[in-house]
Design a protein with these regions (language model features):
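Single conserved hydrophobic/aromatic residue that forms the stacking wall/gate
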Residues: 164-169
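ATP-binding pocket architecture of kinase catalytic cores
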Residues: 43-136
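ATP-binding glycine-rich phosphate-binding loop
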Residues: 19-42
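Proline- and acidic/polar-enriched loop/turn elements at helix boundaries
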Residues: 28-29, 83-84, 139
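Short acidic/polar alpha-helix capping motifs at helix-coil junctions
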Residues: 1-3, 29-34, 52
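Active-site catalytic-loop/activation-segment of kinase and kinase-like phosphoryl-transfer enzymes
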Residues: 1-4, 141-163
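Juxta-kinase regulatory segment immediately upstream of eukaryotic protein kinase catalytic domains
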Residues: 1-25
Length: 169
């Protein structure tokens, strides 16, 4: 389940007043995912995806949201962040960072064919080319430093799990 933060209709209606997307007609949680809360949002103006960020902090998100906008502006078929009335891509909902992006058409391809792989490869190449003109840089938050910390945590959890399992044996 990936709806960690429940949003009531009146809360979402109030939040959407800060966007030029029309009036709310429907919304429902997206059950897939592992880290953020996501909702499909339908308004009188179109379909969107609301993301409530559960782990990343507000100061960490502008890089990603601006990069998504950059890619979309360069013809990459990716969600386009929707700016609020203050021309910001990031807002707050339920005291957490939140953003609204365009909803893409399509479905998940669970068994890709070689043709799918070719199309993904071409799209990835175009994405890299479009990304070259993005003016900002950021260290990979899941790079070498994170891997060391994660490995230590996994080792510690494995040790505790082994100890717990042996005490119940």
């Amino acid at each position: 389940m990936a709806v960690f933060t429940r949003v009531l209709r009146d809360e979402l209606e109030g939040w959407l007043k800060d966007y030029s997307v029309g009036t709310l007609t429907d919304f429902h949680g997206i059950e897939s995912g592992i880290e953020n809360t996501n909702y499909f949002v339908t308004t009188s103006e179109g379909e969107f995806v609301l993301t409530i960020f559960e782990v990343l902090k507000a100061h960490e998100l502008p890089f990603y949201l601006n990069f998504m906008a950059h890619l979309a502006n360069h013809g990459i078929p990716c969600p386009r962040p929707i700016a609020n009335l203050q021309n910001q891509y990031l807002g707050a909902l339920k005291n957490k960072p939140a953003s609204l992006v365009s909803k893409l058409e399509g479905t998940s391809v669970l068994k890709p064919s070689p043709l799918h792989c070719v199309k993904v490869g071409k799209l990835l190449a175009n994405m890299h080319l479009a990304g070259k003109s993005y003016p900002l840089n950021m260290d990979n938050p899941r790079g070498p430093a994170w891997r060391k910390i994660a490995a230590a945590k996994v080792w510690e959890l494995d040790r505790k799990s082994t100890r717990l399992n042996s005490s119940h044996g």
